[in-house]
Amino acid sequence: SSYGVTYVKDESELLDALEIAFECDEKALVEERLVGTEITVGVLGDPPRALPIVEILPQEGSEFYDLDVKYIDPTLVHRIPAAISPKDYHRAEEYAVAAHEALGCKGFSRSDFIVGEHGTTILETNTIPGMTDTSLFPDEARHAGIPFSAVCDELIHIALEGAEE
């Protein structure tokens, strides 16, 4: 949920950012920032299928899709389907389903990507994506014509099948 995540513009900001990160955990990950279009791809079902892709539109005053944008001021502006090329759209769907399967996810997941000059890069896979009123996964399902109650029914069915095995 972006706890402890900070965007630094130059090396002078790195130590302060690491202090914030170490308040959340004893380990920290430092990565190069990728420039491009931020998208997220929900995966639902067994067999898993990609849901319509969400494009996360940049918010004024926010460097990235951070904790404040997600939960404190949840006025996230996003577009479904994402305005990316058909090639990038298909690639992101394939990567999201492949990540879901490779990680052994059951029922649902949501993978985040940056699409840019570098290609389509997966940032992370959320194995238990948010399911609140402001969460992206239920919105993706709605755009696929799947009401929230049907998503819950499908997840319960998958869990019960797994319990029988």
Question: Regions from the language model: what does each represent?
Answer:
Residues 1-9, 17:
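Phosphate/diphosphate-binding glycine-rich loops and adjacent basic-rich segments that engage nucleotide
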Residues 3-4, 79, 141:
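Short, flexible active-site loop motifs that bind/organize anionic cofactors or intermediates
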Residues 6, 31-32, 111:
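Glycine- and other small-residue-rich loops at beta-strand/loop junctions that grip anionic moieties
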Residues 6, 38, 131-132:
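Gly/Ser/Thr-rich beta-alpha loop segments that engage phosphate groups in nucleotides
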Residues 6-10, 43-46, 116, 123, ...:
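Short beta-strand-to-turn element immediately C-terminal to the catalytic PLP-Schiff-base lysine
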Residues 10-11, 46, 108, 130:
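Short beta->alpha junction loops/turns
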Residues 11-94, 121:
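Phosphate-binding site of ATP-dependent enzymes
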Residues 85-165:
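ATP-dependent carboxylate activation and anion-phosphoryl transfer catalytic cores
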